[in-house]
Regions:
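Active-site-proximal helices and loops of the catalytic beta/alpha 8
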Residues: 1-87, 139, 156-187
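Acidic/polar loop patches that form or flank catalytic/metal-binding clefts of enzymes
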Residues: 19-20, 147-151, 191-199
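Aromatic-anchored helix/helix-loop segment that forms the rim or "lid"
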Residues: 66-75, 109-134
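Aromatic/acidic polysaccharide-binding cleft in carbohydrate-active enzymes
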Residues: 90-119, 137-175
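Conserved small/polar residues in nucleotide/adenosyl-binding loops
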Residues: 205-207
Length: 208
């Protein structure tokens, strides 16, 4: 299917791109006993970047610097650079908890929908979550790839899993500070081609 799709899409022009929803490392993904050739076999141009998402969350929430380095560099070392430069970098999707809830809320674990429906962040949790979200968005915008925002994240929307992560956009009740912060990140991101096409090196700093 993907071979046929790629051929049809590319027939419309080389500037047409194909993204795939792959939750793991797409360079060595194996399913149904078959190793997939998503990024090296003329199928996908790039993918949704779930590994970066988890690396960012674990770093911002738990301070896991080594895990962050490993998660990011593994992808960058495994993917062709054109695919890495096009990675869809997000912090929330319709399949996962809202980033604000993930950063500052209780772990959803195996809780059912009734439990999730009744849970909202306290004012203290919400404020703490916003501070972590800003840190996460800095990484989202300036790691290799393309920053992609799940509607409402920039406005401070919270929520657990589907359907609570799909609440309506909070028109008139947006967190204006977060929206302004997001706009500033976008301006900085567009200010230099290095953020879109440059090389990246991570350095671990030990503070005693």
């Amino acid at each position: 299917f993907l071979d046929t799709l790629n051929k049809a899409v590319k027939a419309k022009g080389d500037d047409k791109v194909i993204y795939g929803e792959v939750w793991e490392d797409a360079s060595n993904k194996e399913s149904y006993g078959v190793r997939r050739r998503y990024l090296i076999g003329g199928q996908l141009d790039s993918v949704m970047n779930y590994p970066f998402k988890e690396a960012i969350i674990n770093y911002c929430k738990y301070g896991d610097a080594r895990g962050f380095e490993a998660g990011v560099m593994t992808i960058l070392e495994h993917y062709p650079k054109p695919s890495a430069d096009m990675l869809m970098n997000f912090l929330s999707t319709h399949d996962t908890e809202r980033i604000l809830t993930r950063l500052a809320g209780e772990d959803v674990g195996c809780h059912d929908r009734e439990w999730q429906a009744e849970r909202y962040l306290s004012p203290e949790q919400y404020a703490y979550g916003l501070s972590l979200l800003k840190c996460a968005m800095v990484l989202q915008f300036f790691l290799p790839g393309v920053p992609c925002i799940y509607y409402g994240d920039e406005a401070g929307l919270e929520g657990y899993k589907d359907p609570f992560n799909r609440r309506c956009y909070p028109w008139g009740k947006e967190n204006l500070d977060m929206i302004d912060f997001t706009k500033q990140l976008a301006v900085i991101r567009k200010s230099s081609k290095a953020f879109a096409q440059g090389e990246m090196k991570l350095s671990l700093i030990h503070i005693s």
